[in-house]
Regions:
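Short beta-strand element of the conserved SAM-dependent methyltransferase core
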Residues: 49-51, 165, 311
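Non-catalytic, usually N-terminal nucleic-acid engagement modules in DNA/RNA processing proteins
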Residues: 1-90
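Short, solvent-exposed secondary-structure capping/transition elements
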Residues: 60-61, 104, 320
Length: 346
């Protein structure tokens, strides 16, 4: 059987179109909850291989200008996660299996509930097990979670999506990134987030994990507000909701909505129809959301206003990103709406 080394795996990943590959040994992830344990997917797993593809900076250009939204959903979020990145992950998994080792590609999804189903065998957890993909990437030495819990790397800052392969091949793990060597805790993400979902460090709300001798910490993000904003229930980031529901006054900052409630409301609105009238001739509750759902099966609206765009801008200005550009990203004052959907100055 042909030898397989960590270096061979990384070279094969790059040849398959991935931008980076990191490797963790299984021991680094043993402290995860049972419903997130990779060993519950593949008990013989010895190495966790993390795959990464960049989000092109230009994906955010249309939203930054306030003129074009669909690129973020297609090239920066859903289709990058469900099509472009998995191609490289699939090819790398095949390469590993050509060397005689089993390779389990894991899609970075989430369970519908935890557990989703009762155990199908005595003594094991129920379906569905989904590892924490960003924490696994930290364990594989690719980067760290920023204060917003968005994954950061030295090369791309906050601009990447992640995948995973579990294998029974024992591969040399990568060194861990030092905590806060990429995220400087500048709080730009918290200050700019349109959903008011990221706590400021002064609020002392955080999540903390230990991997070997290193402690990683990030803000305890309000996922209800985050989800409601991401999926367009917030007029501060959505001119579409402002246009199609002009009388709605929903201040997300004042809501105590759960993540599940936000999903339930958002997708009901996005896929919803009503009778056609002169005021709303299409019959869609919100036209853009329905269009994007039909085009891609997903829709994203906020464009990662604070957690990615503002973080990216600050990191680039500070010279903390290896992927450099000739021009600054933000070339004019940032557009902004209030919770009523009215245009306000920055």
């Amino acid at each position: 059987m042909a030898e397989l080394t960590a270096q061979q795996v990384k070279e094969a990943g790059l040849a398959a179109g991935l931008d980076a590959v990191g490797i963790a040994n299984i021991e680094r992830l043993e402290g995860a909850p049972e419903q997130m344990q990779v060993a519950n997917i593949f008990p013989e797993c010895k190495s966790v291989i993390m795959t990464l593809r960049r989000i092109p900076r230009g994906v955010y250009r249309g939203i930054e200008e306030g003129t074009h939204w669909s690129n973020y959903t297609f090239y920066g979020y859903n289709r990058l996660n469900s099509f472009f990145r998995p191609l490289g992950t699939y090819r790398l998994a095949c390469f590993i299996e050509d060397h005689g080792w089993e390779a389990v590609p894991v899609y970075p999804g989430v369970a519908e509930a935890e557990p989703s189903r009762a155990p199908v065998r005595d003594g094991q957890v129920g379906a569905n097990v989904f590892p924490a993909i960003r924490i696994a990437a930290v364990a594989a030495g690719l980067g760290e979670c920023g204060w917003s819990k968005v994954f950061l790397t030295r090369r791309f800052g906050p601009r990447q999506r992640l995948g995973m392969i579990l294998t029974d091949a024992e591969l040399e793990p990568d060194p861990l990134v030092e905590p806060n060597s990429i995220c400087t805790l500048c709080m730009a993400c918290a200050q700019v987030c349109g959903g008011h979902a990221i706590p400021h460090i002064r609020e002392n709300k955080f999540v903390e994990i230990q991997i070997e001798d290193k402690t990683y910490r990030w803000g305890d993000v309000d996922m209800g507000k985050c989800t409601a904003t991401h999926h367009g229930l917030n007029k501060e980031v959505s001119p579409f909701l402002a246009r199609d529901c002009p009388g709605l006054r929903l201040n997300i900052a004042e809501q105590e909505i759960s993540e599940e409630e936000a999903y339930k409301l958002a997708y009901t609105v996005a896929g919803g129809t009503w009778r056609k009238t002169d005021e709303f001739p299409t019959g869609n509750v919100v036209d853009y959301y329905k269009t994007m759902l039909q085009s891609t099966g997903y829709y994203a609206v906020c464009g990662a206003n604070g957690c990615i765009r503002e973080c990216m801008i600050r990191m680039e200005k500070a010279g903390n990103v290896e992927n450099e550009f000739h021009e600054e990203f933000r070339k004019k004052p940032k557009w902004q709406l209030n919770y009523k959907g009215e245009v306000v100055s920055e």
